[in-house]
Amino acid sequence: MITLRKVPLALAIAAGILSAQAGAVDFKGYARSGIGWTGSGGEQQCFQATGAQSKYRLGNECETYAEIKLGQEVWKEGDKSFYFDTNVAYSVAQQNDWEATDPAFREANVQGKNLIDWLPGSTIWAGKRFYQRHDVHMIDFYYWDISGPGAGLENIDVGFGKLSLAATRSSEAGGSSSFASNSIYDYTTRTANDVFDVRLAQMEINPGGTLELGADYGRANERDGYYLVDGASKDGWMFTAEHTQSMLKGFNKFVLQYATDSMTSQGKGLSQGSSIGTSDNINYAMNNNGHLWRVLDHGAISLGDSWDLMYVGMYQDINLDSNNGTKWWTVGVRPMFKWTPIMSTLLEVGYDNVKSQETGDTNNQYKITLAQQWQAGDSIWSRPAIRVFATYAKWDEKWGYAPSGNNTKAGYNPGVAYSDTSLNSFSRGDNDEWSFGAQMEIWW
């Protein structure tokens, strides 16, 4: 009987311990989902200019997307600690109740803080991680993002700023090969593209203003005995300077970036260009040799008790040796009028203009969204939010990229820019459309 009495007591103690541990788990994340319709019929369509790397997102997102983050400080002694962080992401087309999808395992890393006595405040980390990402929320555009599996040492106090060092990887399919048979190369093996990142941040250079400088070097790291296709982009650099100014209860960020060769593709710090394309059974290099210039200004500010404003203006010039580059400029605003601390009206107006280096033709689009929103707070950043919206888009396009896969057109290299002709159309043409719906968005 004494033993039986001890069993409930032991279970109670164990439950208490598990509850305490469970309570220490950090549950964070992001999600968006909704329903929408298109004016001409059918489910909601989303609108993005051909050649533009992003779109204005308010009332213009057609998927359910979620990131579920679980993390916990697993050890702490004084100011030294270890933190384990994970992130699993899901994306579906939001067309049915049951939509099966394979999750993307985006983060799994450990961060050790203050482990080096002579570098107080610094953090050692290793694993898959979203690493110090820089983005424009309004257009969901990441202009400095080397996320992936990696390792690094960050936030080293150098007196006038914080120094961070990191190395990450982004593999590219179909980039390298050894001899397959009869001295013929079969380019199907992925290539490991490495990025080495150095950045100096939090340099106070004026009242309320800080400067961040960064350099990224990317290279294709082919296996021993394997070779890259002739003309592949083997390496490249990206340099970034960003000034952040605190102003009007918000911020303004001014960014200058320059990239070369393998770092020009996405222009955000990931190395690409070692893969190949195939046209008429002939392999050719999908290289990114050339350079990129980007000038960007964006921010979010408060214009009194009743008005908030997001804005962006950007010019980007990707000049490639293959002539497959673009000149893209975009400008947009999103004012918010607050009727009450939890109800607001938003208007988003955005314009994109993309000129093809190969064809000399231009695609353009403007998009307008009006939304009525209920949110948890009186800031333009307040979430969760539930909104109903109506979106109108008008575009005029004259060029596009040749399709790949089953839609490949004979005589046209997939991924290469071509002008529309009377026989073949590569763009969306000249048209307009409108959509409407409801959406929730949350981060926590």
From Swiss-Prot:
Its main location: membrane. One of its GO terms (cellular component) is cell outer membrane. Residues 1-24 form the signal peptide. The keyword Transmembrane applies. The keyword Membrane applies. It catalyses: beta-maltose(in) = beta-maltose(out). GO terms for molecular function: maltodextrin transmembrane transporter activity; maltose transporting porin activity. It comes from the Bacteria. It is found in: Cell outer membrane. Involved in the transport of maltose and maltodextrins. Belongs to the porin LamB (TC 1.B.3) family. HAMAP family: LamB (MF_01301). NCBIfam families: PRK09360.1. This is Maltoporin. It comes from Enterobacter sp. (strain 638).
